[in-house]
Amino acid sequence: SAAVLYFTIGQKSLKQHGQAVATPLQKAAVSSNDRKHEKLTQARYALSMIVSRDTQQSTPDQMATATIETITENTHDAIIGPLVFFVLLGVPGAVLFRLANTLDAMWGYRTPRYELFGKCAARMDDILGYVPARLTSILMALSNPVNFTKAMKSILFTGRRWYSTNAGLVMAAGAGALNIRLGGDAIYNGISKKRLMLGHDEDAESAQASDIQRSIW
């Protein structure tokens, strides 16, 4: 049981992927032009391994934003969610949750080829993730007591309006806890997608490479 649970939880992988983007971004900030271009290219490639959006033209702020969104969302998908279902249903529960989450990641984006599979996978993931997502958002808000109120306001005023409520709550909590802005428009398959800005407080700043390290549990 312990071995199966270990493989359903992706904390180590999540940390490694986050650092793979953060490290070259931080080096790019203090490098000469040629070296900076090289490091930004490394960061864009590392980011492309963990997100579905286009990364070729991403700025450092956009890369930091996308990475933190992925880390916060996957804290729910790969850590808290499996643990909750392991407590409730044991190993089968943890495996079921991760399977639903993986299928949603593979098929959940609405394309003609996978539309039917995608709708079923996304719906199952939404149902199974209802409780874990809300628990994760509360834990994230509590992770930084200084910004607890900001995190809760972000959850209530922006997270619930995200196109995927479970993901929105978790990312909004992360934005508030770090006092940064997440969300905003992003490009998928060459098409710009309008997305809500997450983070309620007026003094919230754009995400930076250093915030990636802060977002890793």
Per-region residue spans from a language model:
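Hydrophobic alpha-helical transmembrane segments
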Residues: 1-95, 108-217
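Active-site His/Glu-centered metal-binding helix of metallohydrolases
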Residues: 99, 103, 107
